Amino acid sequence: MSLVTQSYSAGIEKAVNAAREATPLVHCLTNTVVQNVTANVLLAAGQAPAMVDHPGEAATFAQIASGVLVNTGTVAPHQVESMPLAAEAAVKAGVPWVLDPVAIGALEVRTSLAHRLLELAPTAIRGNASEISALAGLGAGGRGVDATDSVDDALPAAASLAERTGAVVAVSGKRDLIVWDRDGEIRALWLESGHDLMPRVIGTGCALGATMAGYASIAPALESLFSDATCAPIDAKALAVLSAHAHFGAAGQLAGVRAGHPGSFAVAWIDALDELSGADIAARVRVTEASA
């Protein structure tokens, strides 16, 4: 384990354990393709899922949830109405919410919606490189849900979004990038974990956004870690987002050992999300500092 990884591993371990102990209730306004997968993933990760997207209920439920996911993967009229209502209610209630701007850039309705949501103070933003670049106004989007830009190339876009919104910005790819603004200084980390089969399983990215919302809800409980010299200097929100990615990636690594094809991998991955302890997860990932 590298010295940089070791300095973050104590925080990751404690964050994973804290999230499991809290069993956060995650309100998911997400696309219809991944609702079942997302619910199963949240349960395996120690969280509780809810899918409340009726315009008459979304705001009310957002106020009582632990965390909220707003995912633009499908934009039916009732979802377009519900998503801003839920985000506004979450902010008013002090509930963290995650924006996942799926497939924005080339498609007008979801792109307009995502930019509207961006103004509603998301706690965290997650997407692939093309989505993050498009959200920042520095790219045209990818091929549907698939990125056509590299994670490395998305660093300026992620930094721009973090500086503008105060959100922790996560860019998913072969290695994940976590970017945040710490007292006016952009900080960035690379996280290496996961497995090559993960992009071939539906919902791995969308379910990550939901899991991030649950992890973000325990950020206040992580503040006490920063008096501990064994933990690296990282904001509590950023540590929560980093730990959600570590949980997913470590489970992907273990699933890749047990399964060789997408169908069996999906089952093995959900099992691994449930099985791995905080210490197991921290030991399986590699964290390095990125130059922002």
Task: State where each predicted segment sits.
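General beta-strand structural signal in soluble alpha/beta enzymes
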Residues: 28, 50-52, 97-101, 125-129, ...
